[in-house]
């Protein structure tokens, strides 16, 4: 999968390109991440990419011209990497608190893309004409504001890359994460058997895979009900999970 990131701080992306699972994916050429600096498309000696807003007000606004040229360069690069450069296959995404909130289901949908062109804003924002002309979607991490779009862009890429086939080593690792089936994840344990007076639940040591699966599901249900009632209300169980829920309800009555 191909990622082009448009940012005035391309150095920030060394972390995602060089470390951890995402770094390994880049090294093994499963993923390509290229950074494009809009300052490279300016014509003045100061390489300015921002100006004061029309109508007055605080702060600066990123100008449309250098960003539009950076996006066109990103589209060319994406095409050279085999991407179908259109909204359906390689969209231009603007990281913005005004966008659609990122979710696990939207991340899974994004794994079907050939690539992404991710636009990172700074200052007071970006000239609206650039957004209306070039941006296909806006994505937010939540109802809060950061100093720029670089960290959200890395979150987006990390979440998508780890869901790509053969990235995690064991694809079941991603399948068991929180939100994948609509519930929070179950608790996990490893050695030693006892820590701070607390032992590993015996069912996990039993080797009985069906009982372990049921226990993990019961823990997911308990956690989701307690911590994220909104997720629980929206949860739709599978046929097998519905049977387990009935069994849990009967056990609670006893």
Curated annotation (Swiss-Prot):
It catalyses: guanosine(37) in tRNA + S-adenosyl-L-methionine = N(1)-methylguanosine(37) in tRNA + S-adenosyl-L-homocysteine + H(+). One of its GO terms (cellular component) is cytosol. One of its GO terms (biological process) is tRNA N1-guanine methylation. S-adenosyl-L-methionine binds at residues 121, 141-146. Disulfide bonds: none annotated. Gene3D superfamilies: 3.40.1280.10, tRNA(m1g37)methyltransferase, domain 2. It is found in: Cytoplasm. GO terms for molecular function: tRNA (guanine(37)-N1)-methyltransferase activity. Its EC number is 2.1.1.228. SUPFAM superfamilies: alpha/beta knot. InterPro entries: Alpha/beta_knot_MTases (IPR029028), tRNA_m1G_MeTrfase_C_sf (IPR023148), tRNA_m1G_MeTrfase_TrmD (IPR002649), tRNA_m1G_MTases_N (IPR029026), tRNA_MeTrfase_TRMD/TRM10 (IPR016009). Transmembrane segments: none annotated. The keyword Cell cycle does not apply. It is an enzyme of class 2 (transferase). Keywords: Cytoplasm, Methyltransferase, S-adenosyl-L-methionine, Transferase, tRNA processing. Homodimer. Specifically methylates guanosine-37 in various tRNAs. Belongs to the RNA methyltransferase TrmD family. This is tRNA (guanine-N(1)-)-methyltransferase. It comes from Psychrobacter cryohalolentis (strain ATCC BAA-1226 / DSM 17306 / VKM B-2378 / K5).
């Amino acid at each position: 999968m191909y990622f082009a990131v448009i940012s005035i701080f391309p150095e920030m992306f060394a972390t995602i390109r060089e470390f951890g699972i995402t770094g390994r994916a880049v090294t093994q050429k499963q993923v390509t991440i290229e950074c494009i600096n809009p300052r490279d498309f300016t014509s003045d000696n100061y390489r300015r990419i921002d100006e004061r807003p029309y109508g007055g007000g605080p702060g600066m606004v990123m100008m449309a011209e250098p960003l539009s040229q950076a996006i066109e360069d990103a589209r060319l690069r994406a095409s050279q990497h085999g991407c179908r450069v259109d909204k359906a296959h390689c969209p231009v995404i603007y990281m913005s608190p005004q966008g659609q909130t990122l979710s696990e289901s939207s991340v899974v949908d994004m794994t079907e893309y050939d690539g992404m062109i991710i636009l990172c804003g700074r200052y007071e924002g970006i000239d609206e004409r650039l957004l209306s002309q070039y941006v296909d979607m806006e994505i937010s991490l939540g109802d809060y504001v950061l100093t720029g779009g670089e960290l959200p862009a890395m979150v987006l890429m990390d979440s998508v890359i780890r869901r790509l086939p053969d990235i995690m080593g064991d694809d079941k690792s991603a399948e068991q994460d929180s939100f994948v089936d609509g519930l929070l994840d179950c608790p996990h344990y490893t050695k030693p058997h006892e820590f701070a007076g607390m032992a590993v639940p015996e069912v996990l040591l039993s080797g009985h895979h069906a009982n372990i699966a049921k226990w993990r599901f019961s823990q997911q249900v308990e956690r989701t009900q307690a911590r994220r009632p909104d997720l629980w209300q929206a949860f739709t169980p599978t046929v097998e999970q519905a049977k387990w829920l009935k069994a849990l309800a009967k056990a609670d009555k006893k």
